[in-house]
Amino acid sequence: MKLLVGRTYSDPEVQEELKRFAYKTSALKNGGVGINIMYNDEEVVIPVEHVMAMMLTKARDVVNGANGNAGVADVVLAVPANFTDAQKRGVLRACEIASLNCLKVANETTAIALSYGIFKSAKKLFSETEKTNVMFVDLGYTTYSVTVVEFMQEHMKVLSTVVEEGLGGRDYDKAVVDFCVEEFKSKCK
């Protein structure tokens, strides 16, 4: 779903992605992507940002319920490192619709690095004078991302981020399934 946010229906990458979907989609009047649903026995098209907002609302409600209804209004979201400005704006629109104040949209691998750095720095495990470079790898469902970060005590600097689109966990799953199918075919002629 997140790969569709902030993109146009006519985008060739979106069209390729939609081939994998089990539900019906449509182009919106503004060119965006809509999800077709049945509501009160009528087909309705909902913008993908609204669907994402529904998911964020549910997440907020679950967190509130687990925390004695303490109330969550602020959120920091991690998105793939290759997200465009339009995609990030789509995520921000979804937050707005869900009545969440998005403080930051961060790259997923940078968010991982930040978490790692805070933990290690709090335990004083970084040198005050020598730099330590750490590589963070995210094999997501649809992309493969690598970020290299330089750390010193109470210091973090992202050196580089590389993203390979179209190489993710689902591609490995497909390769394994294809291999098993071919093995089965060759042994069961």
Predicted regions: what they are:
Residues 2-16, 24-28, 40-49, 54, ...:
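Oxyanion-binding/catalytic loops of NTP- or PPi-dependent enzymes
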Residues 32-38:
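Short polybasic amphipathic segments
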Residues 21:
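Internal, Lys/Arg-enriched amphipathic helical interaction segments that engage polyanionic partners
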